[in-house]
Amino acid sequence: MQLNPSEISDLIKTRIEGLKAGADAKNTGTVISVTDGICRIHGLSGVMQGEMLEFPGNTFGLALNLERDSVGAVVLGEYEHISEGDEVKCTGRILEVPVGPELLGRVVNALGQPIDGKGPINAKKTDVIEKVAPGVIARQSVSQPVQTGLKSIDAMVPIGRGQRELIIGDRQTGKTAVAVDAIINQKGKGIFCVYVAIGQKASTIANVVRKLEEHGALEYTIVVAAAASDSAAMQYLSAYAGCTMGEYFRDRGEDALIVYDDLTKQAWAYRQVSLLLRRPPGREAYPGDVFYLHSRLLERAARVNAEHIEKITNGEVKGKTGSLTALPVIETQAGDVSAFVPTNVISITDGQIFLETDLFNAGVRPAINAGISVSRVGGAAQTKVIKKLSGGIRTDLAQYRELAAFAQFASDLDEATRKQLERGRRVTELLKQPQYQPLQVWQLAASLYAANNGFLDNVDVKDILAFEKGLHDTLKTKYADLINRIEDTKDLSKDDEAALRAAIEDFKKSAAF
């Protein structure tokens, strides 16, 4: 049997016309390679930057590199079961996490999934993890305080609602302790907290969660944990996920506090992801956009005005301002604050609390260096009573540090210098504080007043903290009215000042310490 060439061409034509392509190359692709949690995928020509991709086995990934022939994606979670030739699908969605009050008291991973064994979280809303920070018009100036309960911070480096205050120092200088104390002190103050643990040991995170639970702070706190054993992608994303959870409260007229512990490890995780995606390295092998990595995160912490909240809630919440206060943590190497990531974050934030190894080892805890720690906007938010009383403390400490260095070489000192040194020693001792024991405003006011007015000058340095504790106990038992007035007004009137002076004199005579 012979076939005409025309018949053959007709046959081929009908076959081609009848062929239906099973896969759409726009929305599906094939895995070319998998290395260290990074997938190269062929196809997916319609994928968006930052879009969620679906891998086999209910695993998701994030499209980060869009190239001519392939897509570089990072796998969120386990990737051992993914192999070459697997099919990948576009989801058409940007990465979202659950938000809302249902998350309070829970420990979740970077995707908002519970990891504390307390059952599922029935959150009613989800939100995207990458958002544009509020614009200039939507913001309001920082004017309300966040009390950390730490004497040295509330007196010398005050933090306001909506501020970004960096906590920076070497390893083992008490950075996490400062942040956790600040969270514990928000009990009963109406501030919701988010603690983001990035790249820490799982045992360390468990310890922090246990301490928060012991002090009744977990009920108003969300813990977002990306441990050292989690993938670099999860560590990099956890900060943005935590920020979105905090923004939920900010955009409903509430106040929230978020701690990023720590952003150095987030930068390391992002560097790892970027190098695996073959992006060109820059200074210290970080990618070119490592500044943007932190700036777009920290700019989302702000105080927003009532109009912004009304617009976002469609008129449900009126006449309320909201705030998200950020306490990013940066770990330095041998006190080098001029390294790449520390200088970046210092320039983004509104001030820094610098913790020093030498002070920590000398027993000054929290080990805050008062000379180079600053708060660029917190002064406007400081409570009136603390603002009145704290000016002298900072001056005393600064002069003491200067004189102490000079006094090492001088044998005979004049009376004024000796007095200044004695006062400085007592103030340094007074600012020491045990962990998990934050102070209320009236306690801080009483301590500062005693220091400023020379009541500590004839108390032995070793007895200062006992004197302070005795004074607080006496005021609590005998002068409850005075305490209530200071707490209510957050100010010290002339009458209250006279009453406080009389109370301290009375306590000193009794020498109950």
Curated annotation (Swiss-Prot):
Positions of ATP binding: G169, D170, R171, Q172, T173, G174, K175, T176
Main localization of the protein described in the UniProt heading: membrane
Keywords: ATP synthesis, ATP-binding, Cell inner membrane, Cell membrane, CF(1), Hydrogen ion transport, Ion transport, Membrane, Nucleotide-binding, Translocase, Transport
E.C. no: 7.1.2.2
Marked site positions, Required for activity: S373
Gene Ontology cellular component terms for the protein in this record: plasma membrane; proton-transporting ATP synthase complex
Localization per Swiss-Prot or TrEMBL: Cell inner membrane
Membrane topology value: Peripheral membrane protein
Family: Belongs to the ATPase alpha/beta chains family.
Protein name: ATP synthase subunit alpha
